[in-house]
């Protein structure tokens, strides 16, 4: 019925306190070799399901706010394009678009959906200089660790034209 030993509760009240003491953290699950261990593994294994859940989401209001800041026909980088939903929207509105994603499976499906090549590339591999009037990184940069943000921010800034827009 009841356990013979009392349950142990975490002595830390906040997440911040817990992460400040990683040596005392309790591991609830173990990553087995058959389970997804990285974000890219997850997207590669679940690409079709991800696309099904995101392709029809209407981002028109946000996309238009971004486009309103750009010159007509500007070059846009869809940085972590996922399904290609936003890439296609920008193309249909007369913009030139380069699209990248780290997931090979998403790249293949997004390329098929958008009709343009989608480059399989990690954020840290962006190596462009003053090419883009806008970089669209919608729901993408959240996949980076804190330690990766400086390098990727530098690469984004370098890839943008002067006065370029990042979303």
Language-model features and meaning:
Residues 12-19, 26-34:
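N-terminal auxiliary segments of SAM/dcSAM-dependent transferases
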Residues 28-71, 73-82:
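Conserved class I S-adenosyl-L-methionine
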Residues 124-135:
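A short acidic, Gly/Pro-enriched loop at the edge of an enzyme's catalytic core
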Residues 163-167:
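Conserved beta-strand signature within the Rossmann-like core of class I S-adenosyl-L-methionine
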Residues 133-148:
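A short SAM/SAH-binding and catalytic strip from SAM-dependent methyltransferases
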Residues 150-162:
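A short glycine-rich, Lys/Arg-flanked "PGG" loop and its adjoining helix->strand segment in the class I
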Residues 83-125:
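Class I SAM-dependent methyltransferase SAM/SAH-binding core
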């Amino acid at each position: 019925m009841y356990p013979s030993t009392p349950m142990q509760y975490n002595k830390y009240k906040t997440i911040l306190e817990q992460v400040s003491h990683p040596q005392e953290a309790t591991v609830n699950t173990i990553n087995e070799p058959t389970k997804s261990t990285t974000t890219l593994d997850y997207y590669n294994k679940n690409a079709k399901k991800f696309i099904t859940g995101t392709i029809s989401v209407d981002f028109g209001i946000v996309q238009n706010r971004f486009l309103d800041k750009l010159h007509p026909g500007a070059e846009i980088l869809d940085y972590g394009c996922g399904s290609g939903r936003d890439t296609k929207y920008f193309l249909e509105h007369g913009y030139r678009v380069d699209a990248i994603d780290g997931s090979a499976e998403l790249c293949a499906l997004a390329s098929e959906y958008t009709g343009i090549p989608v480059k399989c590339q990690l954020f840290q591999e962006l190596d462009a200089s003053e090419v883009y009037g806008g970089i669209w990184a919608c729901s993408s940069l959240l996949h980076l660790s804190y330690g990766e943000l400086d390098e990727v921010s530098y690469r984004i800034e370098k890839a943008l034209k002067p006065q370029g827009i990042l979303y």
